[in-house]
Design a protein with these regions (language model features):
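Residue(s) in the substrate-gating loop at a strand-loop-helix junction
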Residues: 141
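C-terminal substrate-recognition "lid" of short-chain dehydrogenase/reductases
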Residues: 2, 118, 211-245
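Alpha-helical segment proximal to the catalytic Tyr-Lys
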Residues: 126, 171-172, 231
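Canonical Rossmann dinucleotide-binding motif of NAD(H)/NADP(H)-dependent dehydrogenases/reductases
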Residues: 3-33
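Short, small/polar-rich loop/turn modules that mediate ligand/substrate recognition or access, typified
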Residues: 174, 179, 233-235
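Active-site helix of classical SDR
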Residues: 121, 158, 166
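Substrate-binding pocket helix/loop in short-chain dehydrogenase/reductase
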Residues: 96-107, 203
Length: 245
């Protein structure tokens, strides 16, 4: 098992990529705390994992709240004794905030997609330091590399912030044995569910592998970076996009 006896937190773990990551981590031997605002969904995922003899629990968490982060990490350590891995997966899309020219939407995207990563990383790193090691994986996007007028400007900016903050954090926490890396997914079915068939087809045509990705394909990349297999990798950017960029 690639994560045997590890303890992980996965934010946004109630659905989509986060759920895939949480389930894969448990299959690979980890205990996982699922953090999300979607209480019913998060509790259902944790219960389903537990029913299959896995170790998982759910903690309702607003990732933009420092006090919620403190509670999440404290409950994780109280339950499982330590924290080895954090996946900063929680995020929202530009469509969730509406008007691309409104400051309110920009501010919300920055808070959920970028400030949450700063909060989680600094607090998780502090909890990992007594262990002398740890792994933090921050989920960005291919939009963290390339801007597009098709997206809310705050979305690309927030994902770019995650990419660069990850490099800063890798440098800052590396001497404590804590690795920090970013993952940049391309287009997945959940991201295009609300779009028309023409847009979906265009994204597939622009992807050299001529298909959309699946959450589990991103999860396997996250698993690698979280595991000891990546013990000499920090500050890197793993793009999982079928060749889109």
């Amino acid at each position: 098992m690639r994560l045997k006896d590890k303890v992980a937190i996965v934010t946004g773990g109630a659905h989509g990529m986060g759920e895939a990551e949480a389930r894969l981590f448990v299959r690979e031997g980890a205990a996982v705390v699922i953090a999300d605002m979607l209480v019913a969904d998060g509790e259902a995922v944790a219960a389903d994992i537990a029913a299959s003899q896995g170790r998982a629990r759910f903690v309702r968490t607003d990732v933009t709240s420092e006090s919620d982060w403190q509670k999440l990490i404290a409950e994780t350590i109280a339950t499982y004794g330590r924290l080895d891995i954090l996946v900063n997966n929680a995020g929202i899309s530009g469509s969730a905030v509406g008007d691309p020219d409104a400051l309110e939407g920009w501010t919300r995207l920055m808070a959920v997609n970028a400030s949450s990563v700063f909060l989680g990383t600094k607090l998780a790193a502090a909890a990992m330091m007594p262990n002398g090691r740890g792994s933090i994986v921050n989920i960005s996007s291919i939009m963290g590399f390339v801007g597009s007028s098709e997206n809310h400007p705050g979305y690309a900016a927030s994902k770019g912030a995650v990419r660069l903050y990850t490099k800063v954090a890798a440098s800052k926490y590396g001497p404590s044995g804590i690795r920090v890396n970013s993952v940049h997914p391309g287009y997945l079915p959940p991201m295009l569910n609300a779009t028309n068939a023409g847009t979906r087809a265009a994204k597939i045509e622009a992807t050299p592998l001529r298909r959309l990705g699946e959450p589990i394909e991103v999860a396997y990349g996250v698993l690698f970076l979280a595991s000891d297999e990546a013990s000499f990798i920090t500050g890197t950017e793993l793009v999982i996009d079928g060749g889109y960029i």
